[in-house]
Amino acid sequence: MSSEDREAQEDELLALASIYDGDEFRKAESVQGGETRIYLDLPQNFKIFVSGNSNECLQNSGFEYTICFLPPLVLNFELPPDYPSSSPPSFTLSGKWLSPTQLSALCKHLDNLWEEHRGSVVLFAWMQFLKEETLAYLNIVSPFELKIGSQKKVQRRTAQASPNTELDFGGAAGSDVDQEEIVDERAVQDVESLSNLIQEILDFDQAQQIKCFNSKLFLCSICFCEKLGSECMYFLECRHVYCKACLKDYFEIQIRDGQVQCLNCPEPKCPSVATPGQVKELVEAELFARYDRLLLQSSLDLMADVVYCPRPCCQLPVMQEPGCTMGICSSCNFAFCTLCRLTYHGVSPCKVTAEKLMDLRNEYLQADEANKRLLDQRYGKRVIQKALEEMESKEWLEKNSKSCPCCGTPIEKLDGCNKMTCTGCMQYFCWICMGSLSRANPYKHFNDPGSPCFNRLFYAVDVDDDIWEDEVED
């Protein structure tokens, strides 16, 4: 190796190491060579797809995805002793998403670039071409069809093959080739199957999007602080960004209040909802367990064929058979009516507790004719009638009577003074303040100047003035 070639190689490798970061260029340890990773800049809304008639049978054949990043092309090279004065670098070009024919076309163009730069270093020109011109050179546009090269059609050639050999570049969808494909030995599509390729592309795209997000600055719309993306989180549907500290507090408040269905984007009127994975990343394990449990319960509540065991010590979900009102808990074996949640009673009407009479009456009054018939069938007409009558009586008593302060018996006052006597327990009480009166001297309450009802024995009593005047004249 001449000293000029040696110096040129060292300078070129040093320049590449200073231009590119460690993820894009790595110098080999034992030989004059290295590895470069070429990350292509894709146009916006770039789509990839697999056609339904692909050679490989896929469960999701015919799918289409919009991506922002594709896995890099990898150029591995070794510099011979007489580079750059006489010989080109020996290299291999590998990529997951380009077919062997397309990679071979790129290899051929790298050879042409060497011929143009013969006698001078060429690695930077190669890397710039691969990064900036690959898509245009191969006529790749969106949507781009993913394909795996068929090894049965491949006739490999060596790097010393005739330069006059023409290669089919392929297009955006990798057009069909009538003649046998010729593939360069240096072109490697390093992927096992089309299904693996799809998953690798999607995983890489997601990882790169996260990496770009983490390195940018965002303004949190809650605390109005500017923070790195690594300290922020975005909602997947709307892409609204907030800092993790604010979202953590927001999620914790909602979960403690039991509002697990309301972990929406804080942006007004935005319907985006946080995923369970995002919630788990921000809140503590105990709160996430509560969130997970309440979310499952709310989901089960939306299922018409799921009820809960009414036993307080159990409360496990029970599947309800269609057309059957009996539920049997698989945990405690309790048989219950799925309508009233009491012990199963066969064809007998459901029993209604006093607390539920008001709800039953309101439900019946607001129901249409069809729902009224269902309620009559479920509870029985006598129970419905009883509910209506009892609630009417209760409303009348609340409006026209007061309860005895001693025994609670409803008392109606028609006329007379405000000293009342309970018909149930015979207790004296004041109709104005509802206080109990002394049995020895019940009128002291109205004669005592310190009493709030002083001189109010006949307060609010309607007296016929004409009769009173007649009695005075007599």
UniProtKB/Swiss-Prot annotation:
Q: Report the residue ranges where the short sequence motif D-box is annotated in this entry.
A: 37-45
Where is the segment annotated TRIAD supradomain? 216-457
Where would I find the RING-type zinc fingers in this protein? 220-270, 404-433
The stretches annotated as zinc fingers (IBR-type) lie at 289-350
Q: Tell me the subunit arrangement.
A: Interacts with GCN1; interaction takes place in response to ribosome collisions and is required for ubiquitination of EEF1A1/eEF1A. Interacts with the ubiquitin-conjugating enzymes UBE2E1 and UBE2E2. Interacts with AR/androgen receptor. Interacts with TCF7/TCF1, TCF7L1/TCF3 and TCF7L2/TCF4; promoting Wnt signaling.
Copy the domain comment.
The N-terminal destruction box (D-box) acts as a recognition signal for degradation via the ubiquitin-proteasome pathway.
User: Which protein is depicted?
Assistant: E3 ubiquitin-protein ligase RNF14
* Originating species: Homo sapiens (Human)
Gene symbol here is: RNF14
